[in-house]
């Protein structure tokens, strides 16, 4: 997927996407990603999984915004339409509260969930 947007037709068709993907790194697992980010930022990132359910270590958007304001490196973990693998929730430091809406149904397309979460965390 990344190669499509970095070389050939994809890169020509959408050069700004190519530019955005220049900072992308493909990692094998969460531990490798945490090691890389720890080396890069000099501090272990706080890992925050996302999903459609609450967990015992769930935190709200306001709490996470507070951590971000402290300048802590934070690694947000998003899954596919099927969610994250169970072990990721166990390994993560926190799980972000699910995106709530009207009623009990809260399953969103991943793109939509990411957009809503980022807006709630970094919008002014």
Segments from the language model and where they lie:
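Residue-level detector of alpha-helix boundaries and kinks
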Residues: 15-22, 77, 98, 102
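RNA substrate-binding interface of SAM-dependent RNA methyltransferases
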Residues: 1-52, 115-123
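N-terminal hydrophobic or amphipathic segments with adjacent small-residue motifs
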Residues: 45, 73-77, 107
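A short acidic, often aromatic-flanked loop/helix-cap motif at beta-alpha or helix-coil junctions
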Residues: 31-35, 55-56, 102-105
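Structured adenosyl-cofactor binding patch, chiefly the S-adenosyl-L-methionine
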Residues: 82-124
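Long, charge-patterned amphipathic alpha-helical coiled-coil/hairpin "stalk" segments used as oligomerization
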Residues: 53-87, 98
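Short, well-ordered alpha-helix to beta-strand connector turns
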Residues: 44, 71-72, 92-93
């Amino acid at each position: 997927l990344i190669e499509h947007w970095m070389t050939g037709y994809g890169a020509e068709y959408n050069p700004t996407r190519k530019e955005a993907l220049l900072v992308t790194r493909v990692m094998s697992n969460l531990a490798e990603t945490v090691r890389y980010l720890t080396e890069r930022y000099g501090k272990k990132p706080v890992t925050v999984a996302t999903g459609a359910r609450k967990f015992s270590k769930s935190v709200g958007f306001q709490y996470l915004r507070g951590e971000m304001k402290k300048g802590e490196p934070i690694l947000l973990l998003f899954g596919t339409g099927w969610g994250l693998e169970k072990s990721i929730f166990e390994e993560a430091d926190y799980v972000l509260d699910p995106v709530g809406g009207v009623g009990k149904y809260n399953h969103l397309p991943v793109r939509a969930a990411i957009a809503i979460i980022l807006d709630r965390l970094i919008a002014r």
